[in-house]
């Protein structure tokens, strides 16, 4: 059975079967192609879980054909956002791939200037708060840094703004770190303290619609490129280079492959400097 066959009718209880017989999700590739055009995400045809979730979502919305799904996707921004939220869920946790974060902290610690830092995509915010915790632990005045988190997923951005995290999200933190930087409620949920939260601003953006120039000293874009084909990867790198100030640094994820941009010099594993 092909991956897109999951959108075809399946036997179930009698009433559901009656509705399913009217469904026609052939050519669902048209939907994934449109999502690629809008978001740059290319690997949907390989992700059975996301496709299953889209199938369930379409039934909840009482949409039973590819044509209707695609038509609504093009004109209904709220519907499009819900679809994006389904296909862009990315679980993360505090201190993930910490080596590069420690390098970032040492860079700021050894300088006297202020830093604008962008996490793109920021998911549910663990990365930016990890940076603040590490900076504060090293005695860096965190008023020197202004952090921004950009993401497509509105659900993830809401979580990041609330800064509420499960035990799993903070499992790499020490008990002292949890005590110093979080309030723990009666349900076992950890909330980041206000002193850190006020240093971060979260915004909804599509990387391919960003047109700023020389805005940031540091950009972290980790494990985003794995969702793009070569064309979109190269376009994303070009945009990141434009967003970086001269002499600024770009940090990629361990799983990311990027092309050798002429303005980027590799200074250590996963870290690149925009040459002045």
Specify the residue positions occupied by each region the protein language model found.
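A short N-terminal interaction module
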Residues: 2-115, 218, 244
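Short, well-ordered alpha-helices that flank and scaffold nucleotide-derived cofactor binding pockets
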Residues: 106-109, 133-137, 162, 242
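Conserved class I S-adenosyl-L-methionine
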Residues: 114-127, 146-148
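Conserved SAM-binding loop of SAM-dependent methyltransferases across substrates and taxa
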Residues: 124-140
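Extended basic-aromatic, gly/pro-enriched interface segments that bind polyanionic ligands
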Residues: 143-220, 224-228, 232, 257-258, ...
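A short glycine-rich, Lys/Arg-flanked "PGG" loop and its adjoining helix->strand segment in the class I
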Residues: 234-246
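Conserved beta-strand signature within the Rossmann-like core of class I S-adenosyl-L-methionine
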Residues: 247-254
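Core SAM-dependent methyltransferase catalytic element
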Residues: 258-276
């Amino acid at each position: 059975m092909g991956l897109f066959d999951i959108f075809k009718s399946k036997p179930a209880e009698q009433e559901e079967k009656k509705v399913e017989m009217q469904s026609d999700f052939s050519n669902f590739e048209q939907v994934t192609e449109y999502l690629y055009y809008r978001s740059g995400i290319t690997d949907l045809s390989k992700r059975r879980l996301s496709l299953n979730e889209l199938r369930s979502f379409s039934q909840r919305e009482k949409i039973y054909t590819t044509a209707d799904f695609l038509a609504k996707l093009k004109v209904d921004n709220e519907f499009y956002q819900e679809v994006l939220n389904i296909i862009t869920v990315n679980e993360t946790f505090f201190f993930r791939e910490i080596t590069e974060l420690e390098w970032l902290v040492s860079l700021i610690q050894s300088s006297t200037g202020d830093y604008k830092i962008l996490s793109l995509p920021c998911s549910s915010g663990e990365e930016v708060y990890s940076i603040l915790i590490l900076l504060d632990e090293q005695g860096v005045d965190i008023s020197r840094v202004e952090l921004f988190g950009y993401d497509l997923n509105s659900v993830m951005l809401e979580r990041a703004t609330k800064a509420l995290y499960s035990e799993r999200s903070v499992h790499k933190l020490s008990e002292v770190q949890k005590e110093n930087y979080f309030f723990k409620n009666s349900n076992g949920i950890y909330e980041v303290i206000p002193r850190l939260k006020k240093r971060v601003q979260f915004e909804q953006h599509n990387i391919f619609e960003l047109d700023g120039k020389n805005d940031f000293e540091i950009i972290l874009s980790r494990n985003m490129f794995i969702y793009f084909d070569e064309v979109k990867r190269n376009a994303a790198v070009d945009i990141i280079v434009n967003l970086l100030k001269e002499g600024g640094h770009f940090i990629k994820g361990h799983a990311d492959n990027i092309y050798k941009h002429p303005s980027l010099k590799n200074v250590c594993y996963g870290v690149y400097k925009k040459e002045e």
